[in-house]
Amino acid sequence: MALERDFEKFTGGPVVSTRDRMHVTLSHTGIIYFNQNTHRLLGNPAAAALYYSRERDVIAIEPASPRIEQNFPIKPLQSGWRILAGPFVGHNGIRTDHTLRFVHPDIENGVLLLGMRDTVNVTPRRYKKKK
């Protein structure tokens, strides 16, 4: 069947479930959250060293030993994992008023790379209460 000219092809593709993709967020309080899949792809680490490139505006999370004091513990949270990265975020001047989702998190040579310029606001809307 030939399509008429008024049809437009949808090029967005299907939605990939959060179970099958990497999902990473940064909250306004400095909590880095990632799902089970991301934790598994990192090698299921118990702690991580955190790095920041001001030039590229990228956060790097490298699996590390929990025995080294400056490494951040990775703790379970609901169906994922969290890093309490407040000191890291404050030290590097990373500010956000919202929870941000990293659109294209990537793992290179075992290091998770999170581009601060490649984020979307995922903070739930606050609705005004009716009087």
Question: Across the structure, where does each feature detected by a protein language model lie?
Answer:
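Long, contiguous, secondary-structure-rich segments that constitute the structural scaffold
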Residues: A2-I31, Q36-N37, L42-K131
